[in-house]
Amino acid sequence: MSGSSLPSALALSLLLVSGSLLPGPGAAQNAGFVKSPMSETKLTGDAFELYCDVVGSPTPEIQWWYAEVNRAESFRQLWDGARKRRVTVNTAYGSNGVSVLRITRLTLEDSGTYECRASNDPKRNDLRQNPSITWIRAQATISVLQKPRIVTSEEVIIRDSPVLPVTLQCNLTSSSHTLTYSYWTKNGVELSATRKNASNMEYRINKPRAEDSGEYHCVYHFVSAPKANATIEVKAAPDITGHKRSENKNEGQDATMYCKSVGYPHPDWIWRKKENGMPMDIVNTSGRFFIINKENYTELNIVNLQITEDPGEYECNATNAIGSASVVTVLRVRSHLAPLWPFLGILAEIIILVVIIVVYEKRKRPDEVPDDDEPAGPMKTNSTNNHKDKNLRQRNTN
């Protein structure tokens, strides 16, 4: 073997060896965790979710197990629908395996160790095999504490009249943990200037309107314990605060109309079109109407506008348990030639002006024009000339 061919042969042999060590697309790969469940502390009545993400080839199977506090060796498998349907297990398999364990309406008995197990061993479910060898495990500890008792005022309904001040109240009556501070939130956002260290809380709305409605929470934070909160609902009929009064489009274009409102609970939205003065629910037989509803917002999209069908008045209606409201948007659809109308108008004016000029010039000319070949004055005849010649001859004779 020559010296020049030795490095090439060595490189090829190294490539073959390294290729045999790397797992190919169909090669087996042991299960491994990408994401493991995390330990949490919760209050009674709350809920928790644990996530488990595993890889391997073939895709590993995932199971959830549970052991009570101080009984770490007494694991029992958890199934979807267990504990009076408070347990939900959602698992999906693809290139990897992903599973979510969710338990709602927690009780003190839900405390314990939760374990995610994964395996792609062909003998993983053989009872004669040792599970600690065929399955990999990831654990999380869930601690459930007794929720503090919070007494709240009743829900409030805002009326148009009379407009009276509203006072929301919360009172923390019992807790096994030391309070650090408390505050109010509306729809999940902390209200300014409400944070204090007090178990008895009040929030006053002097002139309540529909925009003041929503979910109010009094939130309490403790030392070495999860925060606790209570909810007070402030309800009001919908008040539509924004919409398009009119929409002008050309035939074949798309039109978008929208409405947004304040008020709580979030309304049910309905779009109607007025036919002969009567609002009629929109029937999407043509497949050109698309409606998007999201809490206090709705949107109507019409594609490929038709000048004979789509123009008119469109009404959006918002209705909740307290009341309803509606507004109208006028849709105008112009012809394809609409952009040419200014040009056509100017062209028509020019044509009319030319016609007027031509008619005027024709009327200005005389009815008959004399020919250039005709003499301008009367001509002497030959008879007159002959008569003169005769007189001349007669004088010469005498």
Swiss-Prot record:
Keywords for this protein: Cell adhesion, Cell membrane, Disulfide bond, Glycoprotein, Immunoglobulin domain, Membrane, Neurogenesis, Repeat, Signal, Synapse, Transmembrane, Transmembrane helix
Cytoplasmic face of the membrane: 361-398
Positions of the UniProt region annotated as Disordered: 365-398
Record membrane topology: Single-pass type I membrane protein
The keyword Cytoplasm belongs to this UniProt entry's keyword annotation: no
GO cellular component term, pick one: postsynaptic density
One GO term (biological process): long-term synaptic potentiation
Entry's localization field: Cell membrane
Chain ranges of the Ig-like domain: 29-134, 148-235, 238-329
Signal sequence bounds: 1-28
Gene3D superfamilies with a match to the protein in the record: Immunoglobulins
Identification of the protein by name: Neuroplastin
Record organism: Homo sapiens
Gene: NPTN
